[in-house]
Amino acid sequence: MNLLKKYWIDVVVVVLFAAISFAYFVPADIDGRILYQHDASAGRGLGHELQTYYEQTGEHTRWSNSAFSGMPTYQTAPSYKSTDVLSKIMQVYHLGLPDNVWYVFAYLLGFYILLRAFNFRKELAALGSIIWAFSSYFFIIIAAGHIWKVWALAYLPPMIAGVVLAYRGKYLWGLLVTALFTAFEVKANHVQMTYYYLFVVFFMVIAYLVEAIKQKKFAHFAKATGVCLAGAALGILINSSNLYHTWEYGKESMRGKSELVKKNSANQTNSGLERDYITQWSYGIGETWTLLIPNAKGGASVPLASNETAMKKADPQFMQVYEQLGQYWGNQPGTSGPVYVGAFVLMLFILGLFIVKTPMKWALLAATILSILLSWGRNFMPLTDFFIDYVPMYAKFRTVASILVIAEFTIPLLAVMALKTLIEEKEALKQNMKYVYISFGLTAGVALLFAIAPSLFFSSFISDAEMQALKNIPAEYLSPLMANLTQMREAMFSADCYRTVFIIVIGTALLVLYRYNKLKANVMVVIIAALCLVDMWMVNKRYLNDAMFVERSVRDNEPEMSNTDKIILQDKSLDYRVLNLASNTFNENETSYFHKSIGGYHPAKLRRYQEMIEHYIAPEMQKTMQAIMTAGGDMSKVDGRSIYPILNMLNTKYFILPLQGNQTAPVLNPYTYGNAWFVDKVTYVNNANEEIDKVGKIDLRHEAVADKQFETALKVSNAQGNVSQVELVSYAPNKLKYNVSSEKGGVVVFSEIYYPGWTATIDGQKAELGRVNYILRALNVEKGKHTIELAFDPQSVHTTETIATVSFAVLLILIALIAFLEYKKRKNSNVTK
C-alpha cells in the first residue's frame, strides 16, 4: 500500500506513455495493419535460410550462403542462448506492447528514468520524456525499419541514468541500472549509436569531475566512476558473444582496414571506411536550421508535386519537371526527413544556457556543438579528418549526419533543466526576463526574418545535384523554371518558419503568464508538454503516418515466387548460386529469399568480397549481360570462360535476365566450375595488391593464387594430368561434406567464401584451410579417396557464451541483493514508525 502511495504518479505516467504510444499509430493499430519497412523487408530475405535451418534443426547457424556468396550471421541475425533470459526481461520492460508502439513507449520511459535519476519532479520528467521521444529522427528511423538503431537509442537514456545515480551517491542502484541497461544497449546491436553517446557520457563525467574538485569530493568521484565502470563491464560481459564476434567480424568487413594499398591514399583511413564513404551523408551547414525549422531544406526526398504549399506556386508549364523533382534541396544524396527537436524546445535550450548554473550545462553545450560540427562531415573536413585519423573507432562508421542524435539528447535535457530552474527559482526568473526575450529573439525572431526574406539569408533553393540534372534544359526554359522552383520552395520554407514563430510565441506567452502568477507551475508544465507534443507530433506525421501501414498479410506473407524462381528451384543440386541481373544486384535481398545469391544488401559485407565486386564482379556483370543479350540467350555463342571467370569460380549456375513488361528469364550457365575442383598450380604472392591483380591474369579453372602466409598449409599443387573428382554430398549452411578422389592429390579450391573460423577435416582428421583467389577456401588433399568436411562452429562462440552466462548470473544476484536491502530498509522503517 505504501509502495502504491509513493509511486502512483509514476504508474500514471507509464500508463500515459503507453496511451500516447498507442494513439500515435491510430487507426493502424486498431485495424491490425502494420508498418511496411524497407530495411525490415530486406532483412527477411537475408534471414530466410537461417530461419529455415532453425525450424529444421532447432539450432542457430553462424553462417549463411544466401547473400554475397556467403557470410557470417554475426551482424545479420545475432542470436545467442546466453541472452535468452535477458530478452524476456526486455519484453517485460516493454510491457509486451506491439511493435512500433513499444518503440515509442521505450523512448518515453527511458528518458523518464533518466530525469527521475536526476531527481526531477515527476511532471517535469514526463514533459522531458515527451520532448525527447518525439524528436523527428526517432520516428523517421522507425519508418525506415532501422529497428536496431531504435532499440539502441531507446536504451541509452536509462543507461546514462545509471551513471547519474552513481554520481549522486546511490552506488548500488547506479551499479544495477548501469549494468542492466548497458546489457540492453549492447544487445540492441547498434554499436554506432552506443559509440556516439559515449561522447555524451565523457562530457557528463567531466562535469561531475568539476563538481568533485569544487566540493573536494575526490573519493566520491573515484567510487562513482568505479561503480559506473563495473556496471558497464558487467553489461558488456553479458553480451560477450555478440560484442566479441561483432569486433572480430568488423576486422574482416567493410568497417575494417583494407589490405589493399590504393593510389588515392588520401581517401583511405588508418583503420576503417574510406573518407568519401564515411562522409557521403553529411548534414549541410545551412541544413542545421532544421533543428528549429523542419522544412529548412524541404523535408524528405519525396515528390515535390505532393506538397500542397509548393504546388500553389507552381507554373503549370513545368509540371512534368516538378513530377521528377523532390521536396528536399539539401546536399545529401537523399533523406527520409530532417532532424527537428521542436521549436520551443530549442528556445528553452538557449534559455538554459543563460539561467542554468551547473557544470552539467557546459557539458551538454559542448556535446551539442561537437555533434553539430561532426554532422557536417565533408562540409567541415578539418575536424572530420582529425576524428577519422586520431579518434579511436570513429572511422568505423558511415552516415556522419546521424551523430546529431547527440544534439537530440542534449537539447531537450538542457531545455527541461531550464524549466526546472524557472520553477525552483522563480525570483531569478522575475529578475532575468531579459534572457527569455533574448532566447525568443534568437529563435522566433530569426525564424520570422527567414519567413519574410528567405532569399536574403539563403543563396539557393536548388541543390547542386538538381542543377546538374537541369543543365540540359534549353536556356529560355531553364531561367523561368529555376525562378518558379525557387518561389515554390521559398513558400514551403516560409510556411514552416511562420509555424515555428507561432509555436514559440505560444510557449513564451506561457512563461510570461507564469512569471506574473497567472499560471501555476504544474499547469504551465502540462500546457507546455501538450504544446510540444502537438508540434512534434504534426511534424513526425509527415514522415511516419497511417498511409505507410499495410495489411499484415502484405508483409508477413512469403514473397511471391516468380516463374523464373520456380524454374531455377527445379534444380535440386545441393549448392549453386544465382546472379540476378534484372535487379539492383547489390542493393536488394529479395533474390536471397529463394536462392543463394551473388548479390545482396548489407552495409557491412565482407571487405574482400566488396573489393572483388569493384575489381571483377561488377565489370563481369556488365559484360555478361551484354554478351547474353547479343547471343539472344544462346549460351553456346557466349564465351563464358573468358568473359566471366570470377562468376564461374563462385559457382554461378544461373543468371536472371530482365525482359520487357517487368518479366524475367533464367539462363543456365554451362561454364561454372562447380562446388570444388583441383588446380594444377598455386602461385604465392607477397601482398593483397599482388593477389587481387593476379586473379585477373590466370586461368582460374586450373590455377590459383594465394598469399604466401598460406604456403605452409597449401604447399605445392602439381596436378597436371590428374584424374580427379570432387562431389558435394551433404549441404547445410554451416557444414559441407565432399567425397574426393584423385590420382595425384593436390590443392582443392572450393567455391566458398573464406573466413576465419571455418575448420576442415579429411577422413575425420583436422586439416588446415587456406585462402586462394582472394576470397575462396582451399585445402591440400593427398591422392586417393577421401571424405572432406568443412564446418563453421567457432570455439569463440562457446567460450564467450560461458562468460556471458556467468555474468548474467552475477546480474541476477545483484538484483536479488538490492531487492533484499530495499525490503530490509522498508521493514526497519516500518518498525521505527
Residue ranges and their predicted role:
Residues Y54, E59, N65-P72, P78-S79, ...:
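Extracytoplasmic/lumenal acceptor-recognition loop(s) of multi-pass membrane glycoenzymes
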Residues L115-F134, L172-L175:
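Transmembrane-helix signature of polytopic, membrane-embedded enzymes
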Residues M347, K653, N662, I698-K833:
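Active-site-proximal, structured, solvent-exposed surfaces of multi-pass membrane proteins
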Residues A18-L114, I130-L153, N267-V341, L374-T384, ...:
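Membrane-interface coil-to-helix junctions
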Residues K223-Y283:
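Polar, glycine-rich mid-to-C-terminal structural blocks
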Residues I9-L46, G231-H245, L370-L373, V446-A451, ...:
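Transmembrane signal-anchor helices characteristic of membrane glycosylation enzymes that use polyprenol
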Residues S129, G145-L156, A166-A183, V191-M193, ...:
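Contiguous transmembrane helix-bundle modules in multi-pass membrane proteins
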Residues W102-N119, V345-M347, L414, T508:
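Transmembrane-helix motifs of polytopic, lipid-linked glycan transferases
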